[in-house]
Amino acid sequence: MLRHRTALLPSLFIGLLATRMFVGGAFGYGGDVKPAPDSRADGLAAWEQIYSVLTHPRCINCHTATNYPQQGDERHRHFANVIRGPAGQGVAGLNCASCHQETNADSTGVPGGPGWHLAPLSMKWQDPNDRPLSSAEVCRAVTDRSKNENMEGRALLKHHEEAALVLWAWNPGRRPDGTMRTMPPLTHAQFVAATRTWVEAGTPCPPAK
C-alpha cells in the first residue's frame, strides 16, 4: 500500500503543477500571457468603436497633419489664419488662449477648455490631404509610446476617462450661429467602456491594408 501511494506522488505533483499553470495563465498570474482569441476579437471590435470617435471632427480637428487647426464638421481651416506654432498653442499675438478660455463661450460661439491646444504632429490622425488615416494607422500611432507621451494601456484608459480636452468633445458648446456642435457617435461612457475592453484585450491593432 505504501509503495502504491509513493508511486502516485509524481503523478499528483504533475497534476497540481499543470493545474497551477492553467489557472495562472487563465487569470493572469503567469508572465506575459497573450489574450485569448475571443478576447482579441472583442478588443479589435472595441477599437473600431474608439476609431469612430477619434476621427470625428470634435477630435480630429485638433489632431491634424496641417500647420493649423481645423473647424466645423466639414473641417475647414481655422479662420484668421491661426497657425500651429512651436508648441501647438499658436504664436505670439495669435495664440490659442487669446480666444479660447477655460470654458465654452456660448454667447460668441468660441469653444473653450483648459489648456486649449493642438495635438502634437506625432498624434496626427489624418494625411496631408486632410483624409483620416486608416484604422490600423491611427491604432499604431495611439499605441506607440514614442509618439503618445509614453502612455501604456492603463494610461490611455485614464486619458480617455479624465483628460479635460477629451471630455470637451461631449460638451462642445454652441456654434456662432447658436446651433449646437455635433458630438462623437458614442457617449463618453460608451467610449470609456470600449477603451477598457480594448486595453484589457492587450490594445490589439487591425492589420495594415
Task: Identify the function of each model-found stretch.
Residues 1-51, 71, 84-87, 104-209:
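N-terminal export/targeting leaders of redox proteins
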Residues 46, 55-58:
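Short N-terminal amphipathic alpha-helix/helix-capping patch enriched in small hydrophobics
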Residues 53, 90-93:
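Processing junctions and N-termini across compartments
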Residues 57-66, 93-103:
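The canonical Cys-X-X-Cys-His
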Residues 70-81:
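Short recognition patches in nucleic-acid-associated and regulatory proteins
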